A protein has these predicted regions:
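Intramolecular chaperone/auto-protease modules of tailspike-like proteins
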Residues: 79-208
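Glycine- and small/polar-enriched repetitive beta-structure motifs of secreted/surface proteins
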Residues: 1-80
Length: 208
């Protein structure tokens, strides 16, 4: 059983236990199950998660026009040691961080240039030319560049551990899981501190 509220919400769904609220919310999902879509066009091509068709156990909030998200407190992410196993030390650190290229940019969404299809918007209809770009600056990384660094480092293991998330099977919509950068940054700081302490000790010896 699916639950849908809104025009064409879950219109093509054959899977079960999907929930959608909003016009066209979850409109592209077919055999996918246990998904949640909240807001206008949530889950269509161009939305934050791309077009979800056969995917399951996913949550999508809103479409590509969302500019802010508000919550009173921080998200709490499950991290109980008792629910984990096969621990190994993370080997991505300072060298990986040094290779990252932070940038400022303006969004120029492909969905603004394409026609609406049954799965959302045709993201390959036209090449963005700047006529629909936003007038505000954002900061971050380019997903394709981070993916190349992941692959080079041998870290591109699975969609659940990768820094880069390609939400659709055809790779039309790529994103970054920024919270996963935190352990890497911690490792980089630790490596840098070890180097600083080593150099400080050498200087002390030379000066002594």
């Amino acid at each position: 059983t699916n639950t849908a509220v809104g025009y064409d919400a879950l219109v093509a769904a054959t899977g079960a236990s999907n929930t959608a609220m909003g016009s066209d919310a979850g409109g592209s999902v077919t055999s996918g199950s246990n998904n949640m879509f909240l807001g206008f066009h949530a889950g269509l091509s161009g939305s934050p998660g791309g077009a979800i068709t056969t995917g399951s156990n996913e949550i999508v909030l809103g479409d590509e026009n969302i500019t802010e998200a508000h919550v009173q407190v921080d998200w709490t992410v499950a991290s109980d040691q008792r629910d984990k196993t096969d621990f190994t030390a993370l080997d991505l650190g300072l060298d990986f961080v040094k290779a990252l290229a932070p940038v400022t940019y303006k969004w120029d969404k492909r969905s603004k240039y394409g026609d609406k299809t049954s799965e959302g918007y045709d993201l390959n209809a036209q090449t963005p030319d700047g006529t629909h770009k936003e007038d505000w600056l954002d900061i971050g990384f380019k997903a394709q560049e981070v993916e190349a660094l992941e692959i080079a480092a041998g870290y591109n293991k699975s969609s659940k551990t990768n820094l880069v998330s390609s939400h659709t099977g055809d790779g039309k919509q790529m994103g970054l899981q920024y919270s996963k950068f935190v352990p890497i940054l911690v490792k980089a700081i630790q490596e840098q501190q070890t180097l600083i302490e080593s150099l400080t000790a050498r200087i002390t010896t030379l000066e002594g």
